Amino acid sequence: ALAAARLITPKHKIISIFQPHRYSRLRDLFNDFCSCFNDADHVFLLDVYSAGEEPIENFESTDLEIGLSKYGHKNVSYIKDKKTLMKTILKLAQPNDLIICLGAGSITKIANKLEDDLYYECRNI
C-alpha cells in the first residue's frame, strides 16, 4: 500500500498511522513490520489492538518503534494518546499529503475522526 502511495504522490508526504492487530501477529511478523514502512515519511504507532490476547513481552508498539528505527526509519513515533495523535497529524499534514491508517480494531474510528477534523480545518483556512 505504501509503495503504491509513493507512486501516486511522489512530491508530498506520506503519513502512516499503524495499529498492530494482536500481539502474536506482531511477534510473528515483527521483522516484516520493521521493514515495510520505508515508503512512509512519518510513521505513528498506536497501542496494539489485542483482540483478547494477553501482551507478549518485547512485542509492544514501543518495541516496534525501536525496530523501525533500527531498520533506518527516521520519523517513527509511538503515540499512546489519541488526542495527541490528532493534534500532531493536524499540525503535520499539508494539502495533498497522504494519510494512510493501517491495522484492525479501533483504527477505523480514528480514521473517521481524522477525516472529519481535517475537513473542518480545511474549511476554516
Locate the predicted segments by residue.
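ATP-dependent carboxylate-amine ligase
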Residues: A1-I125
